Structure formats: C-alpha cells, structure tokens
Amino acid sequence: MSDLWIIILTALAGFLTGVMSGMFGIGGAVISTPAINWLGATPLAAVASTLPSIIPGATSGSLRYRREGLLNKRVILWTALSGVTASVSGALLSGKVPGDGHLLMLLTAGLVAFGAIQLGRKPASNEGVEELAAEGASDAGPHAGIEISAQLATAKPRTQWWRLMIIGIAAGGLSGLLGVGGGLIMVPLFTRWVRLPLKMALGSSLACAGILAIPGTITYAIIGQIDWLYALPLAIGIIPGAHVGSALAIKSPDRTLRLIVSSVLGVIAVAFAIGEIYAIIY
C-alpha cells in the first residue's frame, strides 16, 4: 500500500476515532490502534502512535463540552494530577509486561464490562432525579417537589481528592501502558463512584484523557516508538470528528445517551476479551 493511501485511510480512521472520542468521553484508541496496525504499523508502534492524536481530539471535544458548562474542574485537576505520573510509569513499563500485555488487556476488558453494566443501571447522580422531574414529577402528588429536592441533596457528586486520585492512577497507568485514553474506566467510575451527571462525566473524562496522553506521548517520542506517518494523519482526522461526536452527545437525551454509552462500552469489552483470548491461544 502506498504512503498516500496510508495517510488517507489513517485520517479517516482518525475521524471515526474522534466521533467515538467526543461522544463517549474516551481516547478512541480502541478504533485507531487496531486500524493503524492493520494498515502496517507494528503492534508497539500502533500503541505509541495513537497517543499523540488523543491530545488534539480531546482538546477539540472537551472545548465543546466546556461551552455547555459540562466540565468539572476539580474532578479534572485531581484525576489528571495523579494520572500524569502513572502515565509515564506505564509507558516506561510497556515493554516489560508479562504476556505482551494480553493478560492486562483481559483485566481491562473485565473492568470495562463491569463499568458498562453499572453505567446501564439506574443513575447514581442528580441525572436520575432530573429525569424524574422532566418526566412529570408533578403527577406524583403535592410532595413530589420536596422528595426531589431531598434526592438532589443526597445525590451530590463525591469529589474527594483521594477518590479522584485513585481513578487517575488507574486511568493514567492504562493510558501509558496500553495506549488507551483511560476514558474506558473513567466514564463508569465518574458516573457511579463520583456520581457526576453523565454528560459532565463524558466531558471531564475527555479532558482528562487529553492531559494523560501528554506525558505518554513525550515518553514514547523520546524512546523513538512513534511512527509519525500514522500519528499525524490520525491527529488531523480526529479533531473534526471529536467536535462532531461531542455535539451529538450534548444534544442526545440523557437516558438515550446512557443506554448508548453503556452498550458501546459493553461491545468494546467483549471485543477486547475475544481478541486477547485469541492472541493468547494462537
């Protein structure tokens, strides 16, 4: 395949990656990594070359969420603060993981599947109460407003620094080690454990994914594992894609978006698991 076709197809993969990134709050490496591997990049170069594209894509998408007031600065700060160190450590250890990373990817698939199931359940944040109000709480009787206010009071986001730092370490480690943006676990944890409304969880996760990709990108660039023939077209394609994806997410009804996000994460988890089991066996 000529370099021109590689550039065109990689840019297209970048656009699709961006749509998924913006809509689901993830780095999008689940599309870009296998895509550029199929186009000729080595497995290690495919992992390393996705990280540079996550940065502009996450920036494009998170700016769209910011316009709608859907970024939680405290969540982003503490999660990214701990995640940056973990991302560097993960990148440095990427070549030393037993089993070529397959066992770790299986564990990641299990975590994503669990997160998808949790995300698909009834909301654990204010989102659920807001949905109740939107669907006609006035029909529930004269005390409905009091009940909703009480639920809102008890469903405040849990943004303790230690809770966010644990999420950052896990997400950053995966970002550096496997070349994934970390959003695969941040979105479910932000919604279920931190109790952010879904759209705020998506926007905050996307912003964190971009920050966490920076140290990993620098580390991989220094050790010479990034193939810029793939990295640059990916970055060019992902920027408009992320803007489109984030706009679609923002305009979608919360309940519909929750079902879509949980379903997509579930499919990703199953695909990851099947692929890694196949790689281990064969």
Question: How should these model regions be labeled?
Answer:
Residues 9-13, 52, 167, 201, ...:
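Alpha-helical transmembrane segments of multi-pass membrane proteins
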Residues 13-25, 169-178, 212:
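Transmembrane alpha-helix interface/packing and boundary motifs in multi-pass membrane proteins
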Residues 18, 29-76:
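Juxtamembrane transmembrane-helix termini in multi-pass membrane transport proteins
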Residues 31-33, 59-71, 174-175, 186-191, ...:
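Generic transmembrane alpha-helix signature in multi-pass membrane proteins
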Residues 45, 199-203, 225-233:
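Loop-to-transmembrane helix entry
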Residues 47-55, 80, 84, 205-210, ...:
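Transmembrane helix-bundle signature of multi-pass membrane transporters/permeases
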